A protein has these predicted regions:
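Contiguous hydrophobic, core-forming segments of folded domains
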Residues: 34, 38-85, 106-220
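Residue-level signal for mature regions of secreted extracellular proteins and peptides
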Residues: 13-14
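Bacterial N-terminal signal peptides that target proteins for export
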Residues: 1-9
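Extended beta-strand-rich segments in extracellular/periplasmic secretory proteins, especially
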Residues: 82-104, 207-240
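Bacterial signal peptide processing site
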Residues: 21-23
Length: 240
C-alpha cells in the first residue's frame, strides 16, 4: 500500500471503561443535553473539487500514528492509535470492496482505525472499519469492529440496507450471537470520515446517535441510538 504525508488531525476522546465483568454501566458518555436547537444535517451531494481529487484519488493511503492514552480498568493505559484513510470503489450489493470497475460501484472513503495497548499483564487490540460514501448524502454503508484481548474476542458488523442490519458475536453470554435491525440514525463511527470530506456538513444540535461500536463493546451497553447534543465551532466538533 502506498502512503503519503498526513494532514494534522487532532481528536480527543475520553472513555470510562469497564473490566471483563459484563456489568452494564449506567453512566453513558453520550448523555442527553437539552438545548434550544434542533439537529441539522447537510444532505446535499458532495462534489469533489480539484484539490480534493488530487489528494484522495491518487491510489495512496493517508496513515497517521498517535500516542494513545486509553482509560481501562480504572487506569490510564498507554499504547498506539493509527488512522488509515483511503478511497475505494465499493460494491453496494455485497457491501465489499469492488474487484473491478463497474457502474454500480460507489466511491467511498474508508477509515481503518486501530488501537493497541496493554493493561498491565495482557494486550488489547481494537480495529474499526467505516465505509462512507464520498457523495456525503447518506449514512455509512458499512461499519465493523473487532476487539481481541485475553478475556476473549468480539465482532460486530453494521450493514446499511433498508434498515441498519446488525450481526454481532461476543464471548459474553448476554451479547452472544445476535442478528437484529435498527432504525437509521447518525453513527458516531461515520463522523470521522464525514469530517474529512466536509466538516461543515457535520450534524449539530440535539441529535440521536449510535455510539461507536468500540464504545458499545467496552462499556457493555445496548447497541441503539442515544440522545446527545452536537456543536461545531472553528477547529472543533463536540458531542455531549
Amino acid at each position: 500500500m502506498k502512503t503519503k504525508n498526513t494532514l494534522p488531525l487532532i481528536v480527543s476522546a475520553l472513555l470510562i471503561l469497564l473490566s471483563c465483568t459484563n456489568k452494564e454501566s449506567k453512566d453513558l458518555a453520550l448523555l442527553v443535553t437539552k438545548k434550544d436547537t434542533k439537529a441539522t444535517t447537510v444532505t446535499e451531494t458532495f462534489k469533489p473539487n480539484k484539490d480534493f481529487s488530487a489528494y484522495w484519488y491518487t491510489g495512496e493511503a493517508e496513515i497517521t500514528s498517535y500516542k494513545l492514552e486509553q482509560s481501562r480498568y480504572g487506569e490510564t493505559r498507554h499504547g498506539t492509535a493509527i488512522l488509515i484513510y483511503v478511497t475505494e470503489p465499493f460494491l453496494e450489493t455485497k457491501q465489499v470492496k469492488a474487484d473491478y470497475s463497474n457502474p454500480p460501484n460507489i466511491n467511498v472513503l474508508k477509515l481503518n482505525r486501530t488501537k493497541n495497548f496493554t493493561t498491565g499483564i495482557y494486550p488489547y487490540s481494537i480495529m474499526q472499519s467505516t465505509f462512507y460514501p464520498i457523495a456525503n448524502n447518506r449514512h455509512a454503508i458499512k461499519v465493523s469492529c473487532s476487539i481481541q484481548e485475553w478475556c476473549g474476542h468480539v465482532y460486530t458488523q453494521l450493514n446499511n440496507r433498508k434498515q441498519f442490519e446488525i450481526d454481532a458475536h461476543s464471548y459474553f453470554e448476554n451479547q452472544a450471537d445476535s442478528n437484529f435491525t435498527l432504525d437509521k440514525n447518525i453513527l458516531e463511527n461515520e463522523l470521522w470520515t464525514q469530517l474529512r470530506i466536509d466538516p461543515k456538513s457535520l450534524p449539530v444540535g440535539d441529535i440521536s446517535i449510535i455510539p461507536s461500536l468500540e464504545f458499545i463493546h467496552l462499556k457493555h451497553v445496548p447497541l441503539k441510538a442515544y440522545q446527545a447534543s452536537a456543536s461545531l465551532a472553528k477547529g472543533s466538533y463536540t458531542l455531549n
